[in-house]
Amino acid sequence: MGVFVVLLSIATLFGSTSGTALGPRGNHSDCTSVDRGYQCFPELSHKWGLYAPYFSLQDESPFPLDVPDDCHITFVQVLARHGARSPTDSKTKAYAATIAAIQKNATALPGKYAFLKSYNYSMGSENLNPFGRNQLQDLGAQFYRRYDTLTRHINPFVRAADSSRVHESAEKFVEGFQNARQGDPHANPHQPSPRVDVVIPEGTAYNNTLEHSICTAFEASTVGDAAADNFTAVFAPAIAKRLEADLPGVQLSADDVVNLMAMCPFETVSLTDDAHTLSPFCDLFTAAEWTQYNYLLSLDKYYGYGGGNPLGPVQGVGWANELIARLTRSPVHDHTCVNNTLDANPATFPLNATLYADFSHDSNLVSIFWALGLYNGTKPLSQTTVEDITRTDGYAAAWTVPFAARAYIEMMQCRAEKQPLVRVLVNDRVMPLHGCAVDNLGRCKRDDFVEGLSFARAGGNWAECF
């Protein structure tokens, strides 16, 4: 395959809603779109935090998405999260245990709980599901179509972190990209298919800008867990009390409540290859409770990997410095988590490419977005009260790192400008940039954009890792 498998040991979201239960069923033909993402059950699925399937935020963008007529794109970097997956191993065990305890202890399972009588947990763990694979094929097609003046003749240089769901996501992106090209009568018919060019091992023995592992103090941090525990203690007991009243014989902890809520998104994305069937777990909770759940997951990521953790943003500094190198076509300067052996080799880190695609995990995307300063306007999130999306400066896990999340960093040349302009799109939302002078379309001059990444260029507070 020509893939470099590196084995080098070098180091609708927070707003309040009514308290009625939600139980819609979707039309599967309308559930997914290459350009708009997941379109079913938006009043619910947009409140699933990082377990939400990608949906376009174009309508929420403060700047227009279209490229002006007097400009043309000259460079694109896409950074994407893997597609929808089964729960992790530890979560799989926790979810199954909660369900088994209810089945064992409940003396009655009436009405909307009746499905639990014969429910058998069978989602597996860790890996992409068919819906997640389709999401990444759609991303490949979207990337091809959006930048077709380039993609008709140029292949992206593709990297992935070496976990099965991330690597497979990159492969599915390539597949979707090539399928779109083959359906384009204007494409170069002699252009070979792109491939996954570099797969970077994960773990504490490897420097890897697409997966955090080597910052010792960060890996030992409990800041995110503590924040999540604080808010869980605020909202979950009332839900547990309500459920216990409906389920005689059952006693539920706060963690049990969160486990049952998580079953809703995970099962929905696993039941069909387009997620058109809503899990019966979703009907067990009210709209107001889903608003609280969504905030919990956003809080967890903010304090775990974003601006709420003193060592969160620096986990993304290595990738930010790689972006600078690609934008400026100059060697990488970094002393954090960059793999210097890879990045010094033009075969594994070219500087002359036009299109780049990197694939990673949600947590890494959060750190990278903060290292880029995209959410510098987000103030510390309350650990006791739900804050509306307008108060978080556009940050929410469902808006930021849903399944198949994608950020596009575009560079464009415009007739009236001597220097190229840069803008950043997160899930189709053109981001208000910080640290550089932004024009009325959300763009900065490239050199100003790079200069504004002072936190990354200085290496952040990486020295505090050890």
Swiss-Prot record:
InterPro entries: Acid_Pase_AS, His_Pase_clade-2, His_PPase_superfam, Histidine_acid_Pase_euk. Gene3D superfamilies: Phosphoglycerate mutase-like (3.40.50.1240). Pfam families: His_Phos_2. 1D-myo-inositol hexakisphosphate binds at residues 51, 81-82, 85, 88, 165, 301, 361-362. Residues 1-19 form the signal peptide. Its main location: secreted. SUPFAM superfamilies: Phosphoglycerate mutase-like. It is an enzyme of class 3 (hydrolase). It catalyses: 1D-myo-inositol hexakisphosphate + H2O = 1D-myo-inositol 1,2,4,5,6-pentakisphosphate + phosphate; 1D-myo-inositol 1,2,4,5,6-pentakisphosphate + H2O = 1D-myo-inositol 1,2,5,6-tetrakisphosphate + phosphate; 1D-myo-inositol 1,2,5,6-tetrakisphosphate + H2O = 1D-myo-inositol 1,2,6-trisphosphate + phosphate; 1D-myo-inositol 1,2,6-trisphosphate + H2O = 1D-myo-inositol 1,2-bisphosphate + phosphate. GO terms for molecular function: 3-phytase activity; acid phosphatase activity. Belongs to the histidine acid phosphatase family. Monomer. Catalyzes the phosphate monoester hydrolysis of phytic acid (myo-inositol hexakisphosphate), which results in the stepwise formation of myo-inositol pentakis-, tetrakis-, tris-, bis-, and monophosphates, as well as the liberation of inorganic phosphate. Myo-inositol 2-monophosphate is the end product. Has a broad substrate specificity and is also able to dephosphorylate other classic acid phosphatase substrates such as p-nitrophenyl phosphate, phenyl phosphate, fructose 1,6-bisphosphate, glucose 6-phosphate, 3-phosphoglycerate, as well as ADP and ATP. This is Phytase A. It comes from Aspergillus terreus.
